[in-house]
Amino acid sequence: NSTGILYQNINTSTGGLAVVRDNVISIITNTNTANLALRSLGISMFSNNILVERNRVFGLSNAALSPLAKIAALYLRSRADDVNTGMIRNNMFAINTTTNAQIKAIDMQDGVVKANIYHNSVLAEGSSATNSYTLFKSATAAADVKNNVLYNAVSGAGTAYAIGLETN
């Protein structure tokens, strides 16, 4: 796995806010060609008590051969006891790659993730053997999504979606 910025096991009970602001994250590459579910992530957050703003993430790639491998500019997960709502705003995420991996530019994974996602520009292009998404939300994750530009021009065997909503 390859990650640009990783915040993990953030203790939100103390009221602390994790802020990721004004970063340029690029050339995050997984070069392992194994048939494994490896990930290339620009920003990975494990908390709802977050502010992610004014970041630019681009140049992500993943050479893993597994269709379970993943590329995400922003990967969100959270604990069951985290009652906060995160803010994701004014970011630029771009993925342009040829891969077998899943492309989910913004990936809200756990059912307890809660986030406001406002005013972001997200581009996915290149070629993928699997479906691709500029924004993917798991079955029970909560999101307020407003005023984003989501453009998916990925070609290949999979289908390109702007938004993917997993159902129960």
Pin down the residues of each PLM region:
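Extracellular beta-strand/beta-solenoid scaffold signature
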Residues: 1-12, 33-44, 66-80, 99-109, ...
